Amino acid sequence: MRALSVFVALFSFLALSSASPGQDVAKRVTSGSLQQVTNFGSNPSGTLMYIYVPNNLATKPGIVVAIHYCTGTAQAYYTGSPYAQLAEKYGFIVIYPQSPYSGTCWDVSSQSALTHNGGGDSNSIANMVTWTISQYNADTSKVFVTGSSSGAMMTNVMAATYPELFAAATVYSGVPAGCFYSSSNQVNGWNSSCAQGNVISTPEVWGGIAKAMYPGYTGPRPRMQIYHGSVDTTLYPQNYYETCKQWAGVFGYNYNSPQSTQSNTPQANYQTTIWGPNLQGIFATGVGHTVPIHGEQDMEWFGFTGGSSSTTTTATTPPTTSTTTSSGGSSTSTGVAEHWGQCGGNGWTGPTACASGYTCTVINEWYSQCL
């Protein structure tokens, strides 16, 4: 009997020793509270990972990545957003990334952050997602991303750089993916021109910028729901229109001919514009920065509740670097671009000089504009 006991003890020891470190961590994560995970895989930017595993965990759970605003933290977004409570109701896991930078804005300006597997914050967040899928046997068709302000900017970037990971996204008061691009490759840089709504282009240009963040990708892309307030003085309301243009361009929708516009939806003074099953814009009249999180509407958009769109996304055409003239400006008869017009960028064959009084300003490597 003693020999049998020793054998059982040895077998148990070997079984525990053979388990991967990640599996060990997953077993130790306490459900029902915010927990930090430190060994989720490659973390090139030093982004912190926090996770909420509900007590009511589904057998094959979904995942919601909830990304905080500037000055925020994972703890602050966990406390100030409804996703943990909704996780208990619907059984999904919430990942709360935390920015590694002073001021805790996200890097949506460097080339590394704006490139699939480029080594920036987006890369680290993607690795959090794949770790969670592996450790919890998550449903890969129910992985979603959302964020507010700087987190909304990163949400757009995640949808552009890692479209294969996400089924849908909600964006609360952000800017288009690539709008904050730094020509000097500044990490976590601020772009006042973009923030103030002065970077204006066409759906084709914006869509091309998003597609170029994952060159060669032709698979499904996440459905996008864009919220913005009409009196936002941090990220000006023009960014709502530019973000909607971007995703209309990605999905091939006619931005100027939406399928429908619904007043007082999802509440009074909110207007919902639907371009197709993959894109909705929600403009909140009288609301500043940021639009409050609409948790139950998010659950419907993500497909956790009835009446939502299917989480099946639509494949898109291969990325292209071709660009077109900005809708905010045009070329004059003398061959120079007017105010707001495009004047440069990869593949640009139009005018490279601006009308008198304006300067051709590099917005990103794909787009320069007369400002």
UniProtKB/Swiss-Prot annotation:
Annotated glycosylation sites: 191
Signal peptide (from-to): 1-19
Enzyme superclass (EC): hydrolase
BP GO annotations: cellulose catabolic process; xylan catabolic process
Region described as Ser/Thr-rich linker: spans on this chain: 305-336
Lineage: superkingdom: Eukaryota
Keyword Protease among UniProt keywords: no
Renumbered residue ranges of the record's region Catalytic: 32-304
Domain CBM1: 335-371
Pfam families to which the protein is assigned, alphabetical: CBM_1 (PF00734), Esterase_PHB (PF10503)
Keyword Transmembrane: no
Reported function: Acetylxylan esterase involved in the hydrolysis of xylan, a major structural heterogeneous polysaccharide found in plant biomass representing the second most abundant polysaccharide in the biosphere, after cellulose. Degrades acetylated xylans by cleaving acetyl side groups from the hetero-xylan backbone.
Protein name, UniProt field: Probable acetylxylan esterase A
